[in-house]
Swiss-Prot record:
Residues 7-297 form the Helicase ATP-binding domain. One of its GO terms (molecular function) is ATP hydrolysis activity. Residues 770-780 have a biased composition (Basic and acidic residues). A motif (DEAH box) lies at residues 251-254. Residues 1178-1187 have a biased composition (Polar residues). The PIP-box (PCNA interacting peptide) motif mediates the interaction with PCNA and localization to replication foci. Keywords: 4Fe-4S, ATP-binding, DNA damage, DNA repair, DNA-binding, Helicase, Hydrolase, Iron, Iron-sulfur, Isomerase, Metal-binding, Nucleotide-binding, Nucleus. This is Regulator of telomere elongation helicase 1. Residues 758-767 have a biased composition (Low complexity). It is an enzyme of class 5 (isomerase).
């Protein structure tokens, strides 16, 4: 690894750093060496995490080496180097400069904080890639680290805390008891462990990971923890975090401002107080009964391991009185009549709490009493032991009285914190109506009446920052990829930052394209302003803009909306106007859910769709400041484009936003803290710009990445809005007046990037999408969970995920076809169907009634497989992996969906309600009583609108004969259905009914194989080939199949001639089978197109076409629809069903000549014509042998019914080409290439030249027939038919497969 010397410190870096990385590390060292704070912005992809780790650890090693050198010099007392002064050794100069690091224990610890544990895990993985091996510790909560079964099952975090404390105090947790003994083991203390590794190691060694991490913290060189452990004073005390002399690094620091304010704020609702009073009443009643009986409670007897509740009844009663007084004091506040609430200064909180006797003097006793009661009830089961209200009250008291009187007193707190940084806001309880609806006889009076919410909001993140500095932090480093503008960010923190850096990006200008799109394709202005964002004109123009952009952006596309309501409303509008279907036809849509549970499933499905072979990509719809806007991997193909649909300003009328702006304006006007405050309007604009910058940061993730950014709001055209963008983006921004120019430039950008940039390396951790449709089926996201929100339900937003037909979806929409000329690969306005299956669908759509809706709704689960035909490349054969049991993956997916649904239900319901739910499900399974099931589900899910989606998701468990009733129940309870369709009422595992032929007899089994004796029973006089050209040419012996046009996609080309072939086949099928039979055939063919199951379609085909020998040609001609990998099976099945050789089979070799003609063909009258023995060297097919034995003027010797009635049916139109080849090849070219002259490789004798085994061609105006060679001579000589002298061309003559007598 390269070693770089920066500011006198040798940094061991994994690779040669870029210039911007060296600049970044230099600034980090400057902060560390000078003991100052720094704000460092460096975009994701520039390696800032690696730079931070290597620089800080190299600096620590430099300090350690200096101390070691000084100690060595002291021991030898300068004897080794007598001419060198002792002060020049080690860190003596630093000590003289005021940096007294004289021993190893004085070397500062590094505290590395990020927002989530998943981000910390990524940092630890980066640390493993370096050469440094420091002692590492990761701090987490009991919820993440506890492995005790009883504690883990508790749903509430604070219950886990108190139950754990109870077990630790009583020494009843054997995992905790092993900590002191095993914490020094090499396997636990030495390796670099993240949060998951810590849990695994703790489980393996049966030692508590939570307390193990606290022990490791004492000796750790670098400690990883989430933000709130540092910013929240209560958490700092709980984890015993000593900040004196430490270096604190906040990674992803763009969230620090919000976290600082939220950690010092609270909202106390009437429900919190009411639930706390309920618990105190319960404890008071329990302790009163115990005291009256004169016996200790059995749970707290002397032989019990629990310490019990060490409180007098009088103390419990006083605590209840305090809560009642606090509730009364809040209710006594007068509010204006418009329910807008009232705002008080920060100091008012002390007056309010003083009325309830909560002061600096009493807070310790009150907190101790609350803690005892909560711990006393910890671990108890039941719905009436919810101690969340008491725990919240304890947290609130700690926030309000966070400064001890001895450290500054109430006066100083009011002057510094409350008066300047806080506001008290009291407003009516907005959730009262839902609470009142759910209230019952067990609810308290306080919960049933409308109360008031007490809000205590901190508006200065600098308060928490100043507290960290006051704790003695050596250096505070804030770093992120999106801190711009850095100057204003520093003002908000309210502490000095002498070191600032806005690093440029490491990419070149040809790797990024940024455009402001103020207008859509139709010229309408794009705006997310409050008064225009829901207008029909704006939503329609935005939808068209997104659809056109999706055409030119390859692979993954990210679309960010200002908020969830805007995203949901937009999708609802696009669905109603059919715009969503058009977008879905280009790239499947994935929508970011609100809930955390289903988000991982959604993003995994998106990754899998983008990575799927042959995929056209996917679109992910997300929200600014949402889960997808930070921390996720959208590098390379996962995110080639980012579209920002508007400026995500905070809600302007929200009380907290209004008060924040007022607070900033007041502080700026007063010149507080040296005037270092933003104005309210500046802060308001920066909230939107920072969210936009975070979304833009998704597109470029590393040095070789590239992508495009679309800013689709006219306000981005203003200079002040562009000035808020990151410094590395601003030079590339271009404002467009014409939407067509946007598409043109973007298409050119991606063409150049794909040629100049290296292809992304295969992802080792990419979603596991194996080749084939069965693998795609495994990564489908669970349908029920996706329907939990309108925004997540793609069935609602996208009514059809069906493959587009031959006509372009945008054919009738001029605006949406605007960008066709700018696409990378021009696509005609009306594409011809690729393949005969698509041609059949096109033919059926043209035959349907006008206005008939051809597209059907698909579930979200079907999303990943419904688009498969559209994704296949135009060249080359289709790759379809055969699955022996197609039902098994579907069943597995259904099982996975059911499990995920049960997890979601368990998260939403209480333990008692979940037990009721599971019991109802078991009863329904046993009794099939739908009425009882509906009566049970209603109270569980219908009362809370947030649980309506769970009721609708239960649809998957309802039996088919009850699904329609369940749909009615859902509509009655929630106002929305659950996606019922009539076909859902058909049992899925119902055994297939035997198909009857027109005579009423049971059709033969499609898998029937005929013996020789059975084959002899068939009538040999009926020729099989009474239809049109239908056999695929045999594949070329060598070369790439994709290089031969006639073999593209494995089936004959489905251009104009292919459509004629399909239309002719359908016409013949209707004549032969009738309307009912033809409908059955079409239904089976559509099913085959979707599920690729040949057996199903053969069962229907055999029942319809094998009852009468004259229908055999329909069976053989069906081969035009059979996919290449099924051709051989189909030909063998045709032979088995008819007892006759399939016309497309290969000719038998010389060893098989004796088996060419079945014995049944030899008895009867002798057949005229030359025998095979006359041409011993000639190999013939079975059909050829039959034709050779039949002269042109007979139907068959020995036939009792020979006559005109057995002549073939009416002639049909030409095949894919008049010559059996693609247009442009003449007859001579076919013969030279050795291509068969049509479906038959041998035929009758030409009446002109006497050539044998030829297929005749007939004049369209008369019955004149000749072979290919004769026709070519005639047409070259006169271009007229020799018989009728009608002008003819080689394209007009028609192949004749059963020649008429001449």
């Amino acid at each position: 690894m390269p070693k770089i010397v920066l500011n006198g410190v040798t940094v061991d870096f994994p690779f040669q750093p870029y210039k911007c990385q060296q600049e970044y590390m230099t600034k980090v060292l400057e902060c560390l060496q000078q003991k100052v704070n720094g704000i460092l912005e460096s975009h994701t992809g520039t390696g800032k995490t690696l730079c931070l780790l290597c620089t800080t650890l190299a600096w620590r090693e430099h300090l350690r080496d200096g101390i070691s050198a000084r100690k060595i010099a002291e021991r030898v007392q300068g004897e080794l180097f007598p001419d060198r002064a002792l002060s020049s050794w080690g860190n003596a100069a630093a000590a003289a400069a005021g940096d007294p690091i004289a021993c190893y224990t004085d070397i500062p610890k590094i505290i590395y904080a990020s927002r989530t544990h998943s981000q910390l895990t990524q940092v630890i993985n980066e640390l493993r890639n370096t050469s440094y091996r420091p002692k590492v510790c990761v701090l987490g909560s009991r919820e993440q680290l506890c492995i005790h079964p009883e504690v883990k099952k508790q749903e509430s975090n604070h219950i886990q805390i108190h139950l754990c404390r109870k077990k630790v105090a009583s020494r009843s947790c054997h995992f905790y008891n092993n900590v002191e003994e095993k914490s020094l083991e090499q396997e636990l203390a030495s390796p670099i462990l993240d949060i998951e590794d810590l849990v695994k190691s703790g489980s393996k060694h049966r030692v508590c990971p939570y307390y193990l991490s606290r022990n490791l913290k004492q000796q750790a060189d670098i400690i990883f923890m989430p933000y709130n452990y540092l910013l929240d004073a209560k958490s700092r005390r709980a984890h015993n975090i000593d900040l004196k002399g430490t270096v604190v690094i906040f990674d992803e620091a763009h969230n620090v401002e919000k976290m600082c304010e939220e950690s010092a704020s609270f909202d106390l609702t009437p429900h919190d107080l009411a639930s706390g009073l309920d618990i105190i009443d319960q404890v008071l009643e329990e302790q009163t009964k115990t005291a009256q009986q004169g016996e200790p409670h059995p749970e707290f007897s002397a032989d019990s391991t629990s310490p019990g509740l060490n409180m007098e009844l009088e103390d419990i009663a006083k605590l209840k009185m305090i809560l009642l007084r606090l509730e009364g004091a809040i209710d006594a506040v007068e509010l204006p009549g418009d329910d807008s609430g009232v705002t008080k200064p920060g100091s008012y909180i002390f007056e309010l709490f003083a009325e309830a006797q909560i002061t600096f003097q009493t807070k310790v006793c009150i907190l101790d009493s609350l803690d005892q009661i909560i711990q006393h009830l910890a671990g108890r089961a039941g719905v009436f032991t919810n101690t969340a209200g008491l725990q919240k009250l304890a947290d609130i008291i700690q926030i309000v009285f966070s400064v001890d009187p001895s450290e500054g007193g109430p006066g100083s707190l009011a002057g510094l914190g409350a008066l300047q940084s806080y506001k008290v806001h009291i407003h009516p309880d907005a959730g009262h109506r839902q609470t009142a609806q759910r209230s019952d006889a067990w609810s308290t009076t306080a919960a049933r009446k409308r109360g008031k919410v007490l809000s205590y909001w901190c508006f200065s993140p600098g308060l928490s920052m100043r507290e960290l500095v006051r704790q003695g932090v050596r250096s505070l480093i804030l770093t992120s990829g999106t801190l711009a503008p850095v100057s204003s960010f520093a003002l908000e923190m309210q502490i000095p930052f002498p070191v600032c850096l806005e690093n440029p990006h490491i990419i070149d200008k040809h790797q990024i394209w940024v455009g402001v799109v103020p207008r859509g394709p139709d010229g309408a202005q794009l705006s997310s302003a409050f008064d225009r964002r829901f207008s029909e004109e704006c939503l329609s123009s935005l939808g068209k803009a997104l659809g056109n952009t999706a055409r030119v952006v390859p692979c993954g596309l990210l679309i960010f909306f200002p908020s969830y309501p805007v995203m949901e409303k937009s999708l609802e509008f696009w669905r109603a106007r059919d715009l969503a279907r058009k977008m879905e036809a280009l790239k499947p849509l994935f929508v970011e859910p609100r809930s955390k549970g289903s988000f991982s499933e959604t993003i995994s499905a998106y990754y899998a769709r983008v990575a799927a072979p042959g995929s056209t990509g996917a679109t992910f719809l997300a929200v600014c400041r949402g889960k997808a806007s930070e921390g996720l991997d959208f590098s390379d193909t996962n995110g080639r484009g980012v579209i920002v649909t508007g400026l995500p300003y905070p809600p302007r009328m929200d009380p907290r936003v209004v008060l924040k702006m007022q607070f900033l304006d007041e502080m700026k006007g007063q010149g507080g803290a040296g005037g270092q405050f933003l104005s309210g309007q500046e802060w308001y604009r920066q909230q939107a710009s920072r969210a936009v910058n975070q979304a833009i940061g998704r597109v470029i993730r590393h040095r070789q990445d590239y992508g495009a950014v679309f800013l689709c709001d006219h306000r981005f055209a203003f200079a002040d809005a562009r000035a808020q963008l990151p410094s590395w983006v601003r030079p590339h921004v271009r404002v467009y007046d014409n939407f067509g120019h946007v598409i043109r430039d973007v298409a050119q950008f991606f063409r150049v990037a794909e040629r100049t940039m290296p292809a992304p390396a295969p992802r080792a951790t990419a979603p596991s999408v194996r080749e084939g449709e069965d693998a795609v089926r495994e990564v489908k996201s669970p349908g029920p969970l996706f329907s939990t929100r309108k925004a997540k339900s793609l069935d609602l937003h996208v009514p059809s995920l069906k493959q587009r037909s031959s006509g372009s979806a945008a054919a009738g929409d001029p605006e949406s076809s605007l960008c066709v000329e700018y696409e990378q690969e021009p696509i005609p306005a009306r594409q011809r169907p690729r393949g005969l299956l698509a041609a059949l669908e096109h033919s059926e759509q043209q035959a349907g009634s006008p206005g008939e809706e051809q597209a059907h709704s698909c579930s979200t689960l079907f999303l990943l497989s419904a688009k498969r035909p559209a994704e296949e490349p135009r060249g080359g054969r289709k790759k379809i992996r055969l699955v022996s049991h197609p039902e098994e993956p579907v069943a597995g997916a259904q099982t996975d969906r059911a499990k995920l649904y049960m997890v979601a239900v368990k998260q939403e319901l209480s333990q008692a309600n979940f037990a009721t739910f599971t019991q109802a499900l078991q009863d329904y399974k046993g009794s099939d009583d739908f009425a009882a099931l509906a009566a049970c589900l209603g109270p569980l899910f219908a009362e809370d609108p947030k649980k309506h989606s769970l009721l609708q998701g239960f649809y998957q468990f309802v039996r088919p004969h009850h699904k329609q009733q369940f749909e009615e129940v859902c509509i009655q309870l929630t106002g929305r259905g659950c996606g019922y369709r009539p076909e859902h009422s058909i049992p899925r595992r119902q055994p297939a009914q035997p198909v009857l032929d027109p005579t009423g007899r049971t059709a033969p089994d499609p898998k029937l194989t005929l013996s020789k004796a059975a084959a002899q029973q068939l009538d040999p006089r009926e020729h099989l080939n009474q239809g049109r050209p239908h056999l695929s040419p045999r594949p070329p012996p060598t070369g790439d199949p994709g290089s031969h046009p006639q073999w593209r996609s494995g089936v004959p080309r489905a251009g104009k001639q292919g459509q004629r072939a399909v239309s002719a086949y359908l016409a013949d099928a209707r004549r032969a089978l009738g309307s009912a039979g033809c409908s059955q055939l079409l239904a089976a063919l559509r099913a085959y197109k979707q599920d690729d199951d040949l057996d199903k379609v053969l069962a229907v085909l055999a029942a319809l076409t094998t009852a009468k020998p004259e229908d055999f040609p329909l069976l053989h001609r069906f081969s035009m629809f059979v996919r290449p990998h099924h051709k051989q099976r189909f030909s063998q099945t045709c032979t088995d069903l008819t007892g006759r050789p399939y016309p497309g089979m290969e000719r038998p070799g010389p060893q098989e000549e004796s088996l060419v003609v079945p014995p049944v063909l030899t008895h009867g009258a002798p057949q005229p014509g030359p025998s095979r023995s006359e041409k011993p060297g000639k190999t013939q097919s079975k059909i050829s042998s039959l034709l050779r034995q039949r002269p042109a003027g007979t139907v068959g010797a020995g036939s009792e019914d020979a006559g005109p009635s057995q002549s073939p049916g009416p002639p049909h139109g030409p095949a894919a080409s008049e010559w059996g080849e693609p247009h442009g090849r003449d007859i001579a070219g076919q013969q030279a290439a050795g291509a068969p002259g049509g479906p038959l490789s041998a035929g009758c004798v030409c009446q002109g030249c006497g050539a044998e085994d030829v297929v005749p061609f007939q004049c369209p105006a008369c019955d004149f027939q000749r072979c290919q060679a004769c026709w070519q001579r005639h047409l070259q000589a006169s271009r007229m038919c020799p018989a009728c002298h009608t002008a003819s061309r080689k394209q007009s003559v028609t192949q004749v497969f059963w020649p008429e007598p001449q």
